[in-house]
């Protein structure tokens, strides 16, 4: 009778043991795989992070967030150790923020050549893009004209050279496109003003 009981327990116990062992192995694999992916994400450079952005599906939703993303790309261009190939990719990313009208007068090759010259000049002069800020969301001006929606706001950025730190203020004009995305129509230098930041 004892032999029958042991055989029955072994028959019932073996599948339970195999199920538990399988769960432990699957859990261990999942844990190791997740940690490897987390490590890979943590080791990305700012350039890699920016270039991995999917603006077709995750476009900035407000005029301020578009301008801040533009500033983030500029800071990457002028502070990161990048190649000319990465510079071109970053310039192409910037152009995804541009209105069709601005793209028409700034085709990629022209815009890239201009950015390349400026980037090389920054490097030669040891100019550092020290930081940037944009107006508070509550300071963004919006209006409608000829059925289109427009917005404007000021972005401040500072440049550091051997001579000291200089401040630049640019007023950005944006327009909503057919997909309801705010696109940069242009920008111009403006006079220093009190910038209200968040």
PLM region spans:
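Short low-complexity stretches enriched in small and charged residues
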Residues: 24-30, 50, 104-111, 126-132, ...
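A generic structural signal for short coil/turn motifs at secondary-structure boundaries
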Residues: 80, 161-162
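Surface-exposed, charged secondary-structure patches
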Residues: 113-161
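A mature extracytoplasmic/lumenal domain signature
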Residues: 109, 136, 155-159, 172, ...
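Core segments of small alpha/beta cavity-forming domains
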Residues: 46-124
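Short beta-strand edge/turn micro-motifs at domain boundaries
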Residues: 4, 37-41, 165-198
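Amphipathic, hydrophobic N-terminal targeting peptides for secretion and organelle import
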Residues: 1-48
């Amino acid at each position: 009778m004892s032999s029958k009981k042991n055989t029955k327990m072994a028959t019932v116990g073996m599948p339970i043991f195999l199920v538990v062992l399988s769960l432990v192995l699957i859990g261990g694999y999942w844990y190791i795989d997740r940690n490897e992916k987390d490590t890979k994400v943590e080791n990305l450079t700012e350039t890699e992070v920016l270039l991995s952005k999917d603006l077709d599906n995750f476009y900035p939703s407000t005029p301020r967030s578009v301008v801040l993303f533009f500033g983030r790309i500029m800071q990457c261009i002028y502070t990161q150790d990048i190649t000319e190939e990465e510079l071109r990719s970053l310039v192409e990313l910037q152009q995804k923020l541009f209105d069709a009208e601005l793209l028409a007068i700034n085709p990629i090759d022209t815009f890239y050549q201009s950015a390349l010259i400026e980037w090389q000049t920054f490097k030669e002069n040891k100019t550092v893009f020290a930081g940037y800020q944009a107006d508070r969301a509550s300071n963004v001006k919006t209006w409608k004209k000829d059925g289109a929606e427009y917005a404007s706001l000021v972005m401040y950025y500072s440049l550091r050279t051997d001579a000291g730190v200089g401040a630049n203020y640019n007023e950005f004009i944006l327009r909503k496109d057919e997909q309801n995305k705010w696109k940069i129509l242009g920008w111009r230098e403006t006079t220093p003003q009190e910038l209200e930041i968040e």
